[in-house]
């Protein structure tokens, strides 16, 4: 559009009426320019910052999805932009007017608004993760919750006990009267102390020594079967074995001469009496581990086997008696007494001769 200061529009000249109208409009705009600036400054100066920031926070919640959106998100962002421009104009007005106190309050409110926007962003992120998370994939705590009763909850919620500081001191001594002498040594002879006192003390040990124990006869029990005397060897060796010499004890026991009968044989010399309580032999030493040892031994399996030979081979030459069936000889266990059989060639020749006679 051509300028209003020109008298012609393109190649054609303007009409005188249009030229006059354009000049009047130019003067009016120049006259109202200051009025419009004053109106804008008044609007920016009296802008309520708290109300504007509350509106911006409401729009921020709608844009982030925390609140339902009444309009499209683009419309909400346009409204947010208009309110932000009004805040910027307010800042420019304060800067031009050099009002430092008002500008400081304005900056504090803007910082609080920005921190609230950051909190809303974090809250929106948590809500989005909560919607996308699967509750079945969250691990549950281990243990039975039902076993913990109200007492356990009270213990967890109760405050920690305050420990009092205890000072340990010696008991107070009795007050000594002025002029009273301290007590002297105890009456009587002093005890005789020596360096070898500990060596002469008797050592009390729960371990019982076998030398101090005497043989105790075992009483006869009701045995329905007669005792079996297992004496292996000739009869003359029954009484030929020397008897075991008894141990010489320092303390004489009245039943020390009784015979020890571990197999339950009948004893007709005296009645069976338990003369002392059963004793327990305790050994504090650890038992030695069992060790199995064996020397290598070579066996002659060929000599241990029993050879099966035909009956015809066992017949002597020239013996024409009728063959009498006889029982098989018992298996001989000892290989050194076993009869040496014929070798393989002789047995094979005799077997072939027998077959020729049968054919």
From Swiss-Prot:
Biased composition (Basic and acidic residues): 8-27
Biased composition (Basic residues): 245-256
Disulfide bonding pattern of the chain: none
InterPro entries associated with the record: WW_dom-bd_prot_11
UniProt protein name: WW domain-binding protein wbp-11
GO biological process: RNA processing
Domain of life: Eukaryota
Functional summary from the UniProt entry: Activates pre-mRNA splicing. May inhibit PP1 phosphatase activity.
Lineage: Eukaryota, Metazoa, Ecdysozoa, Nematoda, Chromadorea
Region of interest (Disordered), residue spans: 1-38, 235-264, 317-341
Alphabetical list of Pfam families matching this protein: Wbp11
């Amino acid at each position: 559009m051509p300028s209003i200061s020109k008298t012609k529009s393109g190649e054609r000249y303007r009409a005188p009426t249009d030229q006059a109208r354009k000049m009047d409009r130019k003067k009016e705009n120049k006259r109202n320019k200051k009025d419009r600036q004053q109106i804008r400054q008044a609007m920016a100066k009296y802008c309520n910052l708290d109300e504007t920031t509350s509106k911006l926070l409401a729009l921020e919640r709608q844009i982030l999805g925390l609140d339902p959106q009444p309009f499209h998100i683009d419309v909400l962002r346009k409204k947010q932009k208009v309110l932000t421009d009004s805040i910027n104009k307010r800042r420019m007005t304060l800067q031009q007017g050099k009002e430092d106190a008002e500008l400081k309050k304005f900056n504090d409110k803007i910082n609080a608004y920005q921190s609230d926007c950051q909190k809303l962003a974090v809250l929106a992120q948590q809500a989005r993760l909560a919607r996308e998370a699967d509750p079945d994939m969250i691990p549950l705590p281990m243990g039975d919750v039902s076993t913990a009763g109200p007492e356990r909850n009270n213990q967890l919620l109760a405050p920690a006990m305050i420990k009092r500081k205890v000072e340990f001191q010696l008991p107070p001594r009795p007050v000594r009267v002025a002029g009273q002498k301290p007590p002297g040594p105890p009456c009587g002879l002093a005890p005789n102390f020596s360096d070898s006192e500990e060596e002469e003390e008797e050592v009390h040990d729960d371990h019982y020594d076998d030398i101090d124990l005497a043989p105790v006869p075992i009483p006869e029990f009701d045995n329905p079967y007669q005792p079996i005397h297992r004496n292996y060897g000739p009869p003359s060796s029954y009484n030929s074995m020397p008897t075991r010499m008894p141990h010489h004890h320092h303390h004489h026991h009245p039943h020390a001469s009784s015979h020890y009968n571990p197999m339950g044989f009948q004893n007709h010399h005296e009645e069976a009496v338990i003369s002392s309580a059963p004793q327990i032999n305790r050994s504090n030493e650890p038992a030695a581990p069992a060790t199995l040892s064996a020397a290598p031994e070579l066996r002659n399996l060929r000599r241990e086997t029993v050879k099966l030979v035909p009956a015809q081979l066992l017949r002597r030459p020239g013996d024409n008696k009728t063959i009498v069936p006889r029982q098989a000889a018992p298996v001989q266990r000892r290989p050194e007494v076993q009869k040496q059989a014929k070798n393989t060639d002789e047995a094979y020749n005799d077997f072939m001769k027998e077959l020729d006679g049968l054919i």
